[in-house]
């Protein structure tokens, strides 16, 4: 099979975004180099629904990945798509604060309480609803849009 040449990758059609998962820094670079409009990634902790051994990012890799993607015109979303523990929501809030400080373009969230935190503390941050949020009707989707933009 022929290897993809990043300079030969056709642009994504107008109005569409190619959003790709990035479970590691090499995967992020491959997605960016092969035409991704956006990559999404997660931390190696309980804030990430895909927290599997050998995957995901520490803070240094996230910083490198964000820089790499942004230098090439690609957006970066961080998935904080699990539900905070009722007795200890601080790690999820801290992860969102860190994501903002590192320059992510948006966060992907499941928990409405964390969405509210994001809307209140980071009003310019784009919030995306994760599939773990389970908005399965037009009414649910409209609720999220009305509450969080």
Predicted regions: what is each one?
Residues 1-149:
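Non-catalytic helical/linker scaffolds that mediate oligomerization, partner binding
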